[in-house]
Amino acid sequence: MFCNLSPMIDFDALKSEKGLILAVVQDQLSREVLMCAYMNREALEKTVETGITHFWSRSRQQLWKKGETSGHVQKVKEIRVDCDMDSLLLLVEQVGGACHMGYRSCFYRNLEGEVVGEKVFEPDEVYKS
């Protein structure tokens, strides 16, 4: 286990919707928000067990380990639960980029569509079919 989460909050105590809870992922040092994704019980348990983020893909309907294809993993340093117990904050050490579009953060555009984030890799080179 990556950190002292004992006793871990029971997933059933969290206010999930259809068995999923929102997870906000933030860089531990810079506090930059990297991404948001959903976790089910298995994803949270795998994350705690391995220290690497795991999420539930709503589109593929399956568990996925962040960085499994790209190598751009998120090493979990701390997990916090919000006051309403309906979302999680994961403080991580990001290896490479968090966004599958090649940016450090999934929040790389402003409302006008202007790119304001840092591109850290070329997706075509990482996600070869």
Curated annotation (Swiss-Prot):
Pathway: Amino-acid biosynthesis; L-histidine biosynthesis; L-histidine from 5-phospho-alpha-D-ribose 1-diphosphate: step 3/9. InterPro entries: PRA-CH (IPR026660), PRib_AMP_CycHydrolase_dom (IPR002496), PRib_AMP_CycHydrolase_sf (IPR038019). Binds 1 Mg(2+) ion per subunit. Its cofactor is Mg(2+); Zn(2+). It is an enzyme of class 3 (hydrolase). Signal peptide: none annotated. Keywords: Amino-acid biosynthesis, Cytoplasm, Histidine biosynthesis, Hydrolase, Magnesium, Metal-binding, Zinc. Mg(2+) binds at residues 82, 84, 86. The keyword Nucleus does not apply. Its EC number is 3.5.4.19. One of its GO terms (cellular component) is cytoplasm. GO terms for molecular function: magnesium ion binding; phosphoribosyl-AMP cyclohydrolase activity; zinc ion binding. Zn(2+) binds at residues 83, 99, 106. It is found in: Cytoplasm. Transmembrane segments: none annotated. GO terms for biological process: L-histidine biosynthetic process. It catalyses: 1-(5-phospho-beta-D-ribosyl)-5'-AMP + H2O = 1-(5-phospho-beta-D-ribosyl)-5-[(5-phospho-beta-D-ribosylamino)methylideneamino]imidazole-4-carboxamide. SUPFAM superfamilies: HisI-like. NCBIfam families: PRK00051.1. Homodimer. Catalyzes the hydrolysis of the adenine ring of phosphoribosyl-AMP. Belongs to the PRA-CH family. This is Phosphoribosyl-AMP cyclohydrolase. The gene is hisI.
